């Protein structure tokens, strides 16, 4: 199937959302959550995939495990990476992705290994993100955000792994991401978006500093806890890349370093994402084990963010996939029965919730 044809009818550059849908949208209560949505990409396509689950253990990709949105139709580099999804207080769904095709030359999209000179701007250099917003997971608005244009004085070399969370104190959606300035080390920053989720409206600020300035950090993932505090999972390239944790009483700073790694891998991993099991006081940390072939996701579970239980990898333990392999850098959110049923029906997936 031609990837470009997948997108036609699903998303164009900007889709005008129905006023009646947006006006009636609200954040569901936990008792109404009945399903899970996994968003991910893979290396062969650099495109966006969706997978649904009834129980948070077994996931089935929609659209016969083909992309639901082709990277070459939505990204300036003709490929996306690192998709993240969250739900805002307005009931809308927010997806943020890295605008980067690592194999762009191989795919025939450019003549050079990277978009800009590798010696000056480093590995995987790019210019920004793809931001999307929807009230029904089917019709989306889209904006291509070039960080280097918004902040030309920063000499941005790369901007990766954007994630979105609502900052109640600022009453804005906060985008936090990995950024490298010039050919320096990657660090983690945050900035606020406009209400339409089309651009950034504040100067990027550091959200966390690793104790050793020579160690690169990336891929932050922030989870609000019931007591009002926040936990950040992130990657420290301290030896093999590993998942570490920091905690704070505020969303956009003050995170306290903890030395122990959280993942159970011998090799390198990245892309942490924490999600809560519906109706339970349990959280699952998912991460991308990129040091193995084929690539796979690993999982650990916790009730207190102090003690962690290893759940293994997809199809090696309790976590399963039914129709897809080698997912990369994903995120999971909970859905209501109505939302999951609507999405499954749209993509012709015979699954009830």
Regions found by a protein language model. Give the residues of each.
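Bacterial N-terminal signal peptides that target proteins for export
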Residues: 1-10
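Carbohydrate-active catalytic/glycan-binding domains of CAZyme proteins
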Residues: 21-353
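Bacterial N-terminal signal peptides
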Residues: 9-19
